[in-house]
Amino acid sequence: MFFKEIVMNAVNASFTDYKVADISLADYGRKEIKLAEAEMPALIGLRKRYAAEKPLAGAKILGCIHMTIQTAVLIETLVELGAEVRWTSCNIFSTQDHAAAAIAASGVPVFAWKGETEEEYNWCLEQQINVNGKPWDANMILDDGGDLTALVHEKYPTLLDHIHGITEETTTGVQRLLEMWKDGSLKVPAINVNDSVTKSKNDNKYGCRHSLNDAIKRATDMLLSGRRALVIGYGDVGKGSAQSLRQEGMIVRVTEVDPICAMQACMDGYEVVSPYKNGVQTGKKEDINLDLLKNTDLIVTTTGNYHVCDSAMLDTLKAGAVVCNIGHFDTEIDTNYLRGYKWVEVKPQVHQVYRSENENDYLILLSEGRLVNLGNATGHPSRVMDGSFANQVLGQIHLFQEKFADLPASEKAAQIRVEVLPKKLDEEVAAAMVLGFGGVLTQLTSVQADYLGVPVEGPFKSDAYKY
């Protein structure tokens, strides 16, 4: 044999602090984790860089993020750097059961399986927080969407006395953090991982470019070429989604509220339209732009906002159209309204929603309006998630070393904030990713650096620079 055989997980029967769908999937998960590690040079580089220092020794992290193969690499990186973790998924459909099994088999407490009910999802969060009937002495939070952060603040506020900080992965969670900071309910500092360039451009844009069309094709087996799509929102997620559909040959239109994003869509060659006449969202069927919606084969929401695909739009949309969401929560599409109709499950996370007794009058709803690329497929590639998760690790180290919880009470208020990682750390993640692609960065000469007014080793752009 010319290669080293992968050592499979040996499940310790005495370890029971987990709940997954099928622990026997652990070996399968371990094989995929090894493949993912080869595609995640930034994370593996952090393991090597901090192997001796163990900067997270003493960290006890509550983690709530999609329990995927790529997340398994993140978890094991945190553990290798000294942390203890307890994990849940942030979405009822996004868990990859073999990934959860592999993590459980390695001795890490994890509570996640694909297809949880809302009640089971909440149960998992409670199991994560509580050990032997009382709250775990956690001192860090790693979140995606803000559910864990909200639960700790609202139900377990005494835990916050020991929490050094929160790192938040996604747009929706950052919005919630900013609201909490504004109204004074945020009690610890937080790092906005979402707006690191190596997260927002990789995950939000390039990741969605890869994974959206993959999810739709797996769910429907449809040829997308020549069909008409409406992308709601043209932020980074919307940009990647529009590219994803265009590269499949779809005719893509965009709807936007932000004139700058709308201008970008125009410059990128997309027609900017509105589902409502004159762009005024009244919620009334008589004000719907019928010419648009009756000629739309696919709607995808990308905004992180509320009811951007509302009941009036759903009732007037072309029969047989596909409706899906690649934002975080299921509130972008008014799925509660659709619950009043007859649902027929075609296969897991694919439903025909019949709007009348006419057998042809249905919509195809994917992932019940939740995150389609993880509900109907396997999400972003490992190489994309490498940047996001390297930022999470650096954010956890940054906040853990600040030791907010150890500050005198009189000094804490001034330290509560929501901020992005320093640009130098963002550039370090990017450099590791470039190296992973086999790229070679050119170094500035001292003369060039002086001319630009930047250090030779960076950071190379001001904080105001728009990538």
From Swiss-Prot:
Molecular function GO terms recorded: adenosylhomocysteinase activity
CDD domains: SAHH (cd00401)
Necessary cofactors: NAD(+)
GO cellular component terms given for this protein: cytosol
Annotated cofactor note: Binds 1 NAD(+) per subunit.
Catalysed reactions, semicolon-separated: S-adenosyl-L-homocysteine + H2O = L-homocysteine + adenosine
Annotated metabolic or biological route of this protein: Amino-acid biosynthesis; L-homocysteine biosynthesis; L-homocysteine from S-adenosyl-L-homocysteine: step 1/1
Sequence positions that bind NAD(+): 170-172, 204, 233-238, 256, 305, 326-328, 373
Pfam family, one: AdoHcyase
Family the entry assigns: Belongs to the adenosylhomocysteinase family.
HAMAP family with a match to the protein in the record: AdoHcyase
Name of this protein: Adenosylhomocysteinase
Native source organism of the sequence: Acinetobacter baylyi (strain ATCC 33305 / BD413 / ADP1)
Name of the gene encoding the protein in the UniProt record: ahcY
